[in-house]
Amino acid sequence: MNRNLLAHGFLIFALCIGVAGCKSGETYSCPAGDVLKGEPPPNGQEVWCEKTIGGQPVKDGLFIFWTDSGGKMIEGQYKDGKQDGEWKTYYETGEKKSIDHYRDGVQQGEHIGWYINGQISAKGQYKDGQPDGVWKRWGPDGIRNWEEVYKDGKKVS
């Protein structure tokens, strides 16, 4: 009986690690002085770090949001209540959908988007929240569809 119980426990552990990632077993850390809020699936849909500024709670540090089915949908960081650093989005199936970068709540730097099949859909840069420089788009088959150039959010070619 103990042998069966041990084997059953190991099987559940292996399936959890291999298939679901054991969200309840993951650890999440916040910057010093911040408090971890929310719950991951199956009991919740998001976790975030929070601190108080001027008597008001604001997000600061880790932020993760999951779909209704438990797949990770959004992952990023906040700094003093504003998006900061790298933000990733995922399709319901778990494949990456996009990576964007933020500074002080404003999109800044490289954007990369993917189709659900893994092919890159778009690549470009943001400057002060506006498209800037060369932007390229590809079809789901990997063939580039177009290329445009932006300056300060305006298409120039």
Regions found by a protein language model. Give the residues of each.
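Glycine/tyrosine- and acidic-biased, solvent-exposed loop/turn segments at the edges of beta-strands
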Residues: L15-S157
